[in-house]
Regions:
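N-terminal (or domain-start) structured segment
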Residues: 35-125, 164-166, 172, 188-213, ...
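Hinge/capping helix and adjacent helix->loop/strand transition within the periplasmic-binding protein
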Residues: 94-100, 114-201, 250, 263-296
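C-terminal segment of classical bacterial N-terminal signal peptides
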Residues: 19, 24-34
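N-terminal secretory signal peptides that target proteins for export/translocation
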Residues: 1-12
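An extracytoplasmic/periplasmic, membrane-proximal ligand-sensing/linker region
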Residues: 41-43, 185, 226, 249, ...
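Extracytoplasmic/secreted proteins, especially bacterial periplasmic and envelope-associated proteins
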Residues: 58, 62, 66, 87, ...
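C-terminal lobe and pocket-closing loops
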Residues: 135, 221-289, 318-321
């Protein structure tokens, strides 16, 4: 083999080697980020838009601990309260969509921004749904010293004294508020809204007799009704609760159009890679399937949800226009 041919052959081999290397490199860079390196490689921050001890916080911690054990990285809870629970959600919209900042939120994220003149986020546009966690119906409750023993009693009193009968809520735009607004519209009432900074003070004032009624989550009020510390007037659910079989549904009380539930979910910033979302969804569903979490949610009066990220996305998109209509009809605003 002469020198010229050897040089040509060497150049050809080099060319083939470079081509093969470039193909391998291109294949590597074309891999989704979730597979370019193992996820997660560091702790995950979990923004919870409620105070410690609240229901959003409780369910968030339960699931986060189990997910962290399975993933091999800690999920660190970061409680961000304020602005009706909007502060935490707002911070999540500004986080990097890399899977290392996620959020645990309640259903109010589909409601509260729509009451604002300049909403800071759109729940359907600015977040990536990950997994629904749990849901719970609400129940219209009153104190034991209250004169109301049924929904009919309360409605009759409100009609007899328009603009004088009150109802409590855990804050403007919360489900505890929206259900009362639905009842007010459908029963043709004129009530006075007494908003509180959270469900606990609202419930305390109902127990003390300072405010007559309140739509509370079953997770909080069921035990109080069972212990005869609170009176349940009606449950907002298609069926009666097995835990409180004597309490009728609001439909049975004559108001089938009053509908709504509280739900809790994991979301991530918009544009979070789908492979990371799939991993988080898988881990959330694994956590929800464990006996201890199932039992705890059932003990709280809730329903274990789970399912695909698409299920949560569909729920968010369906809830927003429904609540937007109620907000317009009831002329609900928030500063």
């Amino acid at each position: 083999m002469n020198a010229t041919f050897r040089c040509f052959a060497a150049r050809k081999q080099l060319k083939h080697a470079l081509l093969a290397a470039s193909i391998l490199l291109a294949a590597w860079y074309s891999l989704p980020p979730a597979f370019a390196q193992a996820y997660p490689t560091k702790p995950i921050r979990v923004i919870v838009n409620s105070a410690p001890g609240g229901l959003t916080d409780v369910i968030g911690r339960l699931v986060a601990i189990r997910m962290g054990q399975s993933l091999g990285q800690q999920l660190v809870i970061d409680n961000r309260t304020g602005v009706g629970g909007l502060l935490g959600a707002e911070q999540l919209t500004k986080a990097e969509p890399d899977g290392y900042t996620i959020g645990v939120v309640a259903s109010a994220i589909t409601v509260t921004p729509q009451m604002m003149a300049k909403p800071s986020f759109d729940a359907a546009r600015d977040f990536t749904p990950v997994s629904l966690l749990m849901s719970t119906p609400l129940m219209l409750v009153t104190g034991l010293n209250s004169p109301y023993r049924s929904v009919a009693d309360y409605v009759a009193a409100a009609k007899a004294s328009p603009g004088k009968i009150t109802f409590a809520s855990g804050g403007t735009g919360t489900m505890t508020h929206l259900l009362a607004e639905q009842l007010q519209l459908q029963a043709g009432l004129k009530l006075i809204h007494v908003p509180y900074k959270g469900g606990a003070p609202a419930l305390n004032d109902v127990l003390a007799g300072h405010v007559p009624v309140y739509f509370d989550t079953l997770t909080t009020s069921a035990k109080l009704v069972q212990e005869n510390k609170l009176r349940g007037l009606a449950i907002v659910s298609p069926n009666r609760s097995p835990a409180l079989p004597a309490v009728p549904t609001l439909a049975e009380a004559g108001y089938p159009g009053v509908q709504g539930m509280a739900w809790f979910a994991i979301i991530a910033p918009a544009n979070t890679p789908r492979e990371i979302v799939a991993k988080l969804n898988e881990e959330a569903n694994k956590a929800l399937s464990t006996p201890e979490i199932k039992e705890r949610i059932l003990a709280l009066g809730g329903t274990v949800e789970g399912g695909s990220a698409a299920v949560l996305g569909d729920l968010i998109r369906s809830e927003m226009p429904r609540w937007a209509k109620l907000i317009r009809d009831a002329n609900i605003t928030i500063q």
